[in-house]
């Protein structure tokens, strides 16, 4: 009788990423241990002394995690490419090194998004044919469903062919992972008509309409995306997508401050989203919200 031996799954975590690192990252890793298989192992990258202090505060045994000590951190104020190349002992850079060498099976960080993009491009590498990877956000809609928004911050400037490709990537992800049959793909714009928008969106519209590899339903305006009536996938550049995402978060916080209790509004809480996958690369990379607790 032949048996298949499943190797131990090693998940890499940037312990220094996020506004409240390393405390909340280590605490989150300890919480995650309750939900992952016993044959999986968490590998934390960061200042070993700080990581172990948090572990001791929670009474965690010293062998709870594999810890890779690093001495540098790429901050939000750093230039992404320069910092990634110069801070060779940063938690992000070393984490990607381990991912490339196959020492971990996936890497997650709530740190600098720009540096994570650089690492995804040059360490994880893009899938053949992909121009630029993207990150997406799954946002709840009023009809009880959700839509996929991409890009939400990895590429603030996108050429028309990149937006067209995001339509294909988003469609494939929505179908394979979100189980949406023939997902409807729309381009976020200032009007529904094909001639609306700037030079980039006008050119992108033509490419998307002619693509034929996914179900393009045309332009969609921002006031329609939360209804769920028109699109399952909404495409935009990272500047616009991140603005939509932050506006959604701001609306949630404003509603809570006003004492509004509503099941739908609660679904807009970014704390409920552990992270989002980087789409279009040959590795499993997750980017978390920097403000997450």
What are these regions (language model features)?
Residues 121-145, 149, 227-293:
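Glycine-rich phosphate/nucleotide-binding loop
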Residues 23-24, 36-43, 156-222, 232:
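Glycine-rich phosphate/diphosphate-binding loop of Rossmann-like nucleotide-binding domains
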Residues 13-23, 84, 154-164, 286-293:
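Short, glycine-rich nucleotide/cofactor-binding loops
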Residues 21-25, 89-102, 106-120, 131-135, ...:
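Short glycine/serine/threonine-rich phosphate/pyrophosphate-binding segments
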Residues 99-117, 195-196, 201-268:
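Glycine-rich phosphate-binding loop
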Residues 60-104:
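Phosphate/nucleotide-donor binding subsite
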Residues 6-52:
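N-terminal phosphate-binding or glycine-rich loops at protein starts, especially the Walker A/P-loop
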